[in-house]
C-alpha cells in the first residue's frame, strides 16, 4: 500500500505549510497547529524521516514550554503544547514572501524596524542560553501590523551545542563545510545574512547561486563575502559576517541607534491570549480529543455562546468599543 499522510485530528484540516519535520494545519482564522510528519504504511526510509520529525517536534515543544514562561513580542506566541503538537497564533506571510522581487518596495523605516525586532528577539534568546539555529527569512513571519515574529524552533539548541540545520548563506561555515558550535558567532552571522536580505531584497550571491550553488558555498567557507555597501546597515552586515560582535546584546545596542518608523510590537493582551486558548480548546472539544468530558461539554457551550454573543462582545472590548 502507498504511504499516506496522517493528521492528528478526526476532522479534516487544511494544510497551510510543510517543513522538513512538521506539518502545519489551519485550525481557525487565528490559530494553527504544528505536528510531526507522520505516514501510514511508511517505507523503511520514511520511518527514519518520521523518527527524526518526531524528535524535532519534541525539541520544539520543549522550547515553546520555556518561551511560554519567557515570552517576547517578536517571537511567535504558543497557545497550547500537547503530546500531539503545538497550537500557535496564526500570522500572515513570511519575510521571504514579502521580499520577493515582485513585492512592493520596503520603506526604510520599516526596514529598520524589522532589523531591530529581529535582533531584539535573538538577543532575548541569548539571555535564555538558546540559539535558534535556523534563522532565515522563511522562518520569520509578519503579523497584520507588519511586525516581525520568529518561528520554527525545531532546530534550536543550547549555546555550545551542535547545530542541526546548516547551509549558506544563513549558517556560518568554515573549511570542510563545517559550522562552529551554536552561539553568538553563528547567530550573529545568520542575522547579518537576514539583514542583507532585508536591505537589498535578495540573498547574498543570489544570481551566482542560481548558476553554481556549490561555488557560492565554497566562497562562504573561504569567508569571501559580497561587499554589503558602506552605509550604516551595510557596515552592520559586514561586522556581523566578520564576527566583530562578542554578544548579541552588543549588536542590539548598535541597531537601536538606527531610525525606524517608530512602530512597536506587543505581545497578545491577556484577553487575546485567553480567546486564542478558548479557540483551541473549543476545537479539541468538537474534535472529540478532550480528555475531560465535563470540560468538553463546557467548552462546547462556551463555543456556542461565543458564536452567538460572547466572542463578538469580547472583540468589541478588545477594540475599545465597550465594557461588559
Residue locations for each model-derived region?
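ATP-binding glycine-rich loop module of kinase domains
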Residues: 3-69
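Catalytic-loop of the protein kinase fold
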Residues: 122-143
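Conserved alphaE helix
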Residues: 109-124
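Terminal C-lobe "cap" of eukaryotic-type protein kinase domains
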Residues: 242-266
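C-lobe/activation-segment region of protein kinase-like
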Residues: 147-149, 154-246, 250
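Regulatory extensions appended to serine/threonine kinase catalytic cores
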Residues: 265-324
Amino acid at each position: 500500500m502507498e504511504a499516506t499522510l496522517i493528521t492528528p485530528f478526526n476532522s479534516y484540516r487544511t494544510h497551510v505549510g510543510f517543513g522538513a519535520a512538521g506539518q502545519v494545519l489551519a485550525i481557525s482564522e487565528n490559530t494553527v497547529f504544528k505536528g510531526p510528519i507522520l505516514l501510514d504504511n511508511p517505507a523503511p526510509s520514511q520511518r527514519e524521516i518520521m523518527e527524526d520529525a518526531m524528535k524535532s517536534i519534541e525539541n520544539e515543544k520543549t522550547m515553546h514550554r520555556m518561551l511560554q514562561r519567557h515570552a517576547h513580542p517578536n517571537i511567535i506566541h504558543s497557545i497550547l503544547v500537547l503530546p500531539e503538537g503545538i497550537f500557535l497564533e496564526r500570522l500572515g506571510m513570511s519575510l521571504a514572501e514579502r521580499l520577493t522581487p515582485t513585492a512592493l518596495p520596503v520603506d526604510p523605516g520599516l526596514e529598520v524596524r524589522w532589523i531591530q525586532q529581529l535582533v531584539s528577539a535573538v538577543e532575548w534568546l541569548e539571555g535564555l542560553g538558546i540559539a535558534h539555529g535556523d534563522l532565515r527569512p522563511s522562518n520569520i513571519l509578519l503579523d497584520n501590523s507588519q511586525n516581525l515574529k520568529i518561528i520554527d524552533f525545531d532546530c534550536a539548541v543550547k549555546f555550545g551545542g551542535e547545530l542541526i540545520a546548516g547551509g549558506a548563506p544563513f549558517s556560518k561555515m568554515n573549511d570542510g563545510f563545517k559550522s562552529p558550535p551554536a552561539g553568538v558567532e553563528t547567530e550573529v552571522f545568520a542575522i547579518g545574512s537576514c539583514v542583507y536580505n532585508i536591505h537589498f531584497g535578495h540573498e547574498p550571491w543570489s544570481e551566482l547561486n542560481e548558476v553554481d550553488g556549490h561555488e557560492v558555498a565554497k566562497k562562504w567557507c573561504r569567508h569571501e563575502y559580497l561587499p554589503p555597501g558602506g552605509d550604516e546597515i551595510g557596515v552592520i552586515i559586514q561586522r556581523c559576517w566578520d564576527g566583530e560582535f562578542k554578544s548579541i546584546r552588543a549588536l542590539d545596542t548598535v541597531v537601536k541607534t538606527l531610525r525606524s518608523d517608530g512602530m512597536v510590537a506587543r505581545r497578545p493582551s491577556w484577553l487575546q491570549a485567553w480567546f486564542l486558548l478558548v479557540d483551541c480548546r473549543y476545537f479539541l472539544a468538537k474534535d472529540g480529543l478532550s480528555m475531560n468530558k465535563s470540560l468538553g461539554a463546557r467548552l462546547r457551550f462556551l463555543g456556542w455562546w461565543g458564536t452567538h454573543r460572547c466572542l463578538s462582545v469580547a472583540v468589541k472590548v478588545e477594540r475599545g468599543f465597550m465594557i461588559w
